[in-house]
Amino acid sequence: MKLVIVSGRSGSGKSVALRVLEDLGYYCVDNLPLPLIGTLLAQLKGSNDLVAISVDVRNIAEQGKVLQDQLALLENDTEIISFFLNSNDKVLLKRYSETRRLHPLSKNHISLQEAIKLEGRLLEPIAKIVDHYIDTSALNIYELSDQVRQILLGSVDKELVINFESFGFKHGMPTEADFMFDVRFLPNPHWEIELRPFTGLDEPVQEFLGRQPLVNKFIWQIENLFETWMPHLERNNRSYLTIAIGCTGGQHRSVYIADQLAKRFRQGSKHTVNARHRELNISDTNN
């Protein structure tokens, strides 16, 4: 079993780190009371071996060394990784001013600046013993996510679900697309009377479009575009990438091209690649 503990000053990005862990398959609990760590792991053992908890100043301040005592009681086969997130006082003041959230120590009737400084003093013993200390002062949420992911996986690459979706413009454009390509300029099988009843998934249409230099060039260029930029899309903290291909009716050209792109991206890909043909009401899911 692996236990990841995320601590740090309020406003430094603990919730961002916890969301990354959740995306990686961890069972996450925010601000778990420290004496319940052992109970939580015992209940999850066998059903979920990846667990992450966040610990804030209210737990640390009130219970002192309870965290270390609780960790010492865990089974020997529990791998523990700890993070401490911090930012300088000026950045934390700015973040709190922008969000207008209450600081956890504000109940002590002290100013925000005093609460931030007090929290730093209370958490200092924890900051000295963690495995990974991350200063988030100059990081945005994507950069912080990348750092956490890289520490845990050794890589910032993230598995994506890539959806290729065909559609017809005359039926409306899809609203969920990240990228959209208009293929209405390509040769249209609709004007070949014998091909009109078929779709882009049928062999006669595939043979017709496969003979068209413009179609092949377009597919190659789209494939090359996403192969070039995929590493950067992986680092963009996204889980889904939807690429929409549109023709007039969503029956021939867009269907064929979306299908061909899905097949090409499935070859040797670590990502889940799906093809969906909206106007045909057909989905093809594969890894």
Swiss-Prot record:
Whether GTP-binding counts among this entry's keywords is: yes
Write out the residues that bind ATP.
G8, R9, S10, G11, S12, G13, K14, S15
Q: What GO molecular-function term can you cite, just one? A: ATP binding
Q: Which residues bind GTP?
A: D56, V57, R58, N59
Q: Which UniProt keywords apply?
A: ATP-binding, GTP-binding, Nucleotide-binding
What this chain does, per the entry, is described as:
Displays ATPase and GTPase activities.
HAMAP family (UniProt xref) = RapZ_like
Per the record, the similarity remark reads:
Belongs to the RapZ-like family.
Q: What is this protein called?
A: Nucleotide-binding protein Sfri_3380
Organism annotation = Shewanella frigidimarina (strain NCIMB 400)
Its lineage opens with: Bacteria, Pseudomonadati, Pseudomonadota, Gammaproteobacteria, Alteromonadales
